[in-house]
Amino acid sequence: MPARTVCFGSPCRAATLSALLWLAVAPSAFAQNASGTTEARPSDVAGDVGDGGLPAGLIQTHETAPELSIVNELYTDGDETKFKKDFEKPFQEALKSSTLTDNDKKAIDAGAKYWVYRFTMKKYYEEEPPKKADKLVPQKGAPPRERLHNLRKNLIDVVRNNAKITPVAREYFLRQVTKLSEDLLDNNLVVRQNILLLLGQLPMDNGNIAKGIEPAPYIPAYTVLLKVIKDEKQHEAAKISALTGLLRICRLGLAAADPANDKKRAEIAMALVPELARKDTHWWYQFRLAECLGVAGVTFDPGNKNNPIVLQTLADVVADKSRHWQARCEAARAIGRLPLDNTLNMTPVLFEIVKLGNDMAQAYNANPKKDSWANYFFTLYLAFKAENSKPETHIAGGKRKPGLLEALPPKEVKDVYEQVLQMVSHLVDNPGKQYSAEQLEGIDTWLKNHTPTNKRITASSPEIGSKPVPVPKPMPANGKASTPPTAPVAEK
């Protein structure tokens, strides 16, 4: 494949918190088109007026998320003063202790509360006063300007930049931070997002930046992040922040083959499957769910080894034309990161991946400038290959490299890969130029000649895309049975 410098991953993957807040303020602004489908439309062919700004029908009436109006301060200026006066020095001393006394724990408890509860103080996230020079006035209903990212950084520095902190003190402090964070899950949306991002960033060690070794995540934080994912009342912007942490924990903390790790990754995957099976959620959320399922590396329902629930759900997303290109392509990429065995009929899955490429080629020809086509096609390409720009050495819990070329016999996957490779190579060699009629006809002929007669992954599986996937009950962190998620309510 010709060499080319590309940015793997959509803007979503490198999204800022402010963009997540925009999702809270304009929940429908990212819709691919007014009907919510990915089919080519007349406007795709004709182009939108001036090809500038957002297409007609994309901007819709919306209201600011009510979660942005919540004010529930759990800490005061007086509490800050009291901590600095009475507990700051004992807190710093306690972090040096290798055997924590009751007084040490009391000091660390106070320190954890100081660092966590301050996130709820309005002064750290309220709108700044208007500038007098240009008389700028904050836009009514706009999300508050935040300074909470500084609190996140400073809290992490408490353990990362403290050369004298002991392992036992670090673990106890992180445990208390995680525990107290649960008290913020019904606070202002900005507060929730920041505390959830923090949980995914908590470092169990300092890593070795010089050698490219990232700090290990604090794995127990995943239970709080999963609590947000399972809560149907949580805003999707908060859930996306939770997924960011789960991605890091799965990638850096749970990837090694180990029974305990396998159990946690399965618990995470089973919580994500019913969320991805829903169709009424934002495409950005769906994209991140698929990405996290790929990193979790679980194929089967741990309660039923004959049910490849994760693979089935991802394959259904790939085949679903009502979903966004990014979600569908990321689902294909995630499939290449699952452990696959010879009990699975992968023929219909591979067929749907090529069919997705064909769908995109048709839509690309309708309007080559309309979407992030290069990103979509390269994400689809990564279903077969490991990502070089962010080295992927092996799938979670396994030894093989990511990608369907590594997972399946060459005779089963090589021809499929070549079909996708041709589509991607066209964008590399001819950016902005349409596929020729001969190219499209060739893909169409291949699809007609390779249409599978059996569209089931296993004998007991539903046909891909035929009906809703039977999702398992999410497994709670406490191990107790939980009630199944209620039917989703469509956004008004």
Q: Which residues make up each language-model segment?
A:
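N-terminal secretory signal peptides that target proteins for export/translocation
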Residues: 1-12
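N-terminal acidic, proline/glycine-rich, low-complexity intrinsically disordered segments
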Residues: 2-4, 31-35
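Bacterial N-terminal signal peptides
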Residues: 13-28
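Extended repeat-based scaffolds of very large eukaryotic assembly and lipid-transport proteins
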Residues: 34-290, 301-309, 325, 347-354, ...
